[in-house]
Design a protein with these regions (language model features):
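Structured secondary-structure scaffolds
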Residues: 4, 12-13, 64-176
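N-terminal, positively charged nucleic-acid-binding surface of large information/translation enzymes
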Residues: 1-93
Length: 176
């Protein structure tokens, strides 16, 4: 099944997942100051830049300060490392498993999952704050389960527990 992230069934899944995560206390509101690439719609750390430029657009990111919502990804760092080490076939081939483990040795930062509507007008509105939309890379990753009818769909129940993904190496870090 092919799905677009603009479809209502996808929006319903994203809204549900966001609300579930928010209700569990895994999403918080905070101010962020950092380097922002307009072309990527993404914040970068200094260490991710190439000669001070966005690695994709080769342009200097803008330093901005704004309030957004964040997913407590840092809380899952040790669990992820343990899971990958205890399940060697979880990421294959080995070189990419090692790459992900190397990435996870650095402090895992919480993930900014929103953009203010005042700056970005398109996107799925956060169910707990109508002034914000979901960051595209957070909602796009959920299309794997929304296409399968998450959470009750028969296709989801059949395929997701044993799913295997083939991920291009240039988006490995985003998926990891």
């Amino acid at each position: 099944d092919f799905i677009r992230t603009t479809e209502e069934r996808h929006k319903r899944v994203v809204t549900r997942v966001l609300q579930d995560i928010y209700d569990k206390g895994e999403i918080y509101y905070s101010e962020y100051e950092g380097l922002y690439c307009v072309g990527c719609e993404r914040f970068y750390q200094e260490r991710e830049l190439v000669d001070g430029l966005c690695p994709d657009h080769k342009k200097e990111p803008k330093r901005i300060k704004e309030s957004n919502y964040f997913f407590r990804m840092s809380a899952y760092q040790n669990w992820l490392i343990d899971h990958i080490n205890q399940n060697p076939d979880f990421i294959r081939p080995k070189q990419y498993r090692n790459e992900v483990l190397s990435f996870l040795k650095e402090p895992l930062e919480d993930l900014c999952i929103s953009r203010p509507k005042s700056r970005l007008t398109w996107g799925i509105t956060l169910p707990f704050d109508e002034n914000y939309v979901t960051y595209v890379w957070f909602d796009a990753l959920l299309n794997y389960v929304s296409a399968l009818g998450y959470p009750e769909g028969e296709t989801y129940q059949t395929f997701w527990p044993s799913v295997q993904h083939i991920i291009a190496k240039d988006i490995l870090k985003t998926h990891a």
